[in-house]
Amino acid sequence: MASLLWGGDAGAAESERLNGHFSNLIHPQNHLLGIKSATIPNIDGSVNRIEEDDEDDVVDLAANSLLNKLIRQSLVESSHRVEVLQKDPSSPLYSVKTFEELRLKEELLKGIYAMGFNRPSKIQEMALPMMLAHPPQNLIAQSQSGTGKTAAFVLAMLSRVNALKLFPQCLCLAPTYELALQTGRVVERMGKFCVDVQVMYAIRGNRIPRGTDVTKQIVIGTPGTVLDWCFKRKLIDLTKIRVFVLDEADVMIDTQGFEDQSIRIQRALPSECQMLLFSATFEDSVWQFAERIIPDPNVIKLRKEELTLNNIRQYYVLCGNRKDKYQALCNIYGGITIGQAIIFCQTRRNAKWLTVEMMQDGHQVSLLSGELTVDQRASIIQRFRDGKEKVLITTNVCARGIDVKQVTIVVNFDLPVNQAEEPDYETYLHRIGRTGRFGKKGLAFNMIEVDKLPLLMKIQDHFNSSIKQLDPEDMDEIEKIEY
């Protein structure tokens, strides 16, 4: 695990002070000594360069998607209502409660159970009968991370592969190298008893000479490399593809060039090819892309139960500067019982400063930001889940999708604002939504400067919720706070 250090321009003295305390931050038991001001050593021997970090942390959709895959330990029981729009509304709508009802090949059923699946998830109940239907049906599906979406389309690919035919028959596009590998691992695990079915990766670094005879039946890759393999190197004959999967469509269109490359690949597929598209969200741009690339689809949408603030008590504390904010935070910590807490900062510099202050005062703290690799983030979140650190300080990279049951308090050390310096309502909602999870009650504290009070009032009006002022010096008032 890397130990991170960020350089600021707050002056050499403060920088030196921060450097001295930051080396054992992420894993306190690992005292990484001798850190230079310009570089930070990782445990694996590599080095992180320090950069200016007064900017807001940018949320990377692909990285967050991979992170959610890495930290899921089991299927999530979705709180969404599944809505199915059939291509032919008059045809009967089937769902299944067991995998046996799907009449799968014995080796596939063994693979599913070996992976730990006991019964289909809510999404799988509706999607699998469509994906495995004869003749094949196209599908556009919305699915949150952790609901078994990848397993569902992998099952569809493995079901339609003819192991005796030694050429690519199933093609899956993913937006990144890492996400492609994650999908491939699911193929390899589910297909472990399908002895004659193999997977190949069309990803950067996997250089295959032009004219090579590709004999593996399932190809998983990124759009650019797949396009090169199909049209330039002639490694894949798209007219022989039986199943085409486009995964993470919302991430795909967020990456320059991938949308056009994906459409070019899809247009070379035969009309009888089954086409499946998955996306976590369905903004207008994603929906327009999906309709362009998937002809005559069935559609599965999720009607999300609204994130509610009703079970979260919200407070604000007026402060003069960040030291006042920290003192108020200490007073709150001294007055109420806290399980685990997530503290959000707008910039990496503030996150680093706050982390060092809390470490100096003996708190068990970990720091999460966009500068860490996805594996490092996953490790930090797992440690936080395991209770090894009680406080997670983060930027917006952790604002959504990460559920830790023990979190009882969320602190906005900085209010979330957009580039126009207006309140970022959606980020606020997802930040404080990290507490009050799973039907439990939670607390949210906003540390704000006086000139930011109008922004907070806009947030209060927007959500039609009450945000009460708290006097951080009144310990009696703090001690009366209840969940």
Swiss-Prot record:
GO terms for molecular function: ATP binding; ATP hydrolysis activity; mRNA binding; RNA helicase activity. It comes from the Eukaryota. A motif (DEAD box) lies at residues 247-250. Residues 130-300 form the Helicase ATP-binding domain. Transmembrane segments: none annotated. ATP binds at S143, Q144, S145, G146, T147, G148, K149, T150. It catalyses: ATP + H2O = ADP + phosphate + H(+). Phosphorylated on threonine residues. The phosphorylated form is found in the cytoplasm but not in the nucleus. Keywords: ATP-binding, Cytoplasm, Developmental protein, Differentiation, Helicase, Hydrolase, mRNA transport, Nucleotide-binding, Nucleus, Phosphoprotein, RNA-binding, Spermatogenesis, Translation regulation, Transport. Its main location: cytoplasm. The keyword Metal-binding does not apply. InterPro entries: DEAD/DEAH_box_helicase_dom, Helicase_ATP-bd, Helicase_C-like, P-loop_NTPase, RNA_helicase_DEAD_Q_motif. ATP-dependent RNA helicase. Required for mRNA export and translation regulation during spermatid development. Belongs to the DEAD box helicase family. This is ATP-dependent RNA helicase DDX25. It comes from Bos taurus. The gene is DDX25.
